[in-house]
Amino acid sequence: ADGFRDYFVQLTECEPARAAKFGMDHYTWLCINPKEAQDVAFARDVMKLIPEFIDRPNVLGIGEIGLNRNTSHEMTIFEEHLDLAVRLNQLVLIHTPHLEDKLKGTVMILSALKNRPDLDPCRVLVDHCEEHTFPLVKEAGYWAGLTLYPTSKLNPKRAADILELYGMDRVWANSAADW
């Protein structure tokens, strides 16, 4: 987990200093990514580091938490991240799977959130929504994130169609590089 301490220092000290040299502010979220949640003990060790960094001025909250392959280990760590966010009174950024079972993962995430009356939906963003998941997230009362990719996944045309159908209330738009 010490490698993550170095990573969190990079995100909260080095990157803001580097960005400032170019006149920019740098902000970050802190968590252990769902792809790394299969080793629950390791993930818990990393999560123990987060309180040390959470009050840094460039930290936005707990994220990008969620699911990757919709496994029980990922769900365990997701729920423990939610506990941490509530305990530390933090915003939450949630990752939905980039897989053919995105719908299943999104439903699992929304089901877990439904059981959390201690989480204010206005403080939760469910990201990487697509046509079949966007309305579910919006109907549940959470912020819906649209991640735009230049040539794959959710392109600008599809995102515009989603916004035309469902409106722009509680929508977060961001971009990512194609892999």
Question: Whereabouts are the PLM-identified features?
Answer:
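Mid-domain alpha/beta scaffold segments of enzyme catalytic cores
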Residues: 1-100, 104-112, 128-132, 139
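Short helix-capping segments at alpha-helix termini
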Residues: 20-22, 115-120, 166-167
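Structural detector of well-ordered beta-strand residues that form the stable sheet scaffold
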Residues: 27-29, 93, 125, 145, ...
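Short, motif-level signal for alpha-helix interfacial/capping segments enriched in acidic residues
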Residues: 42-49, 151-166
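Short beta-strand/loop segments at the ligand-binding rim of alpha/beta enzyme cores
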Residues: 91, 119-123
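Histidine/acidic-residue-rich catalytic or RNA/ligand-binding cores of hydrolases
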Residues: 102-111, 134-140, 153-163, 177-179
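Short hydrophobic/aromatic-enriched beta-strand-loop microsegments
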Residues: 143-150
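Short acidic/histidine-rich active-site segments
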Residues: 169-179
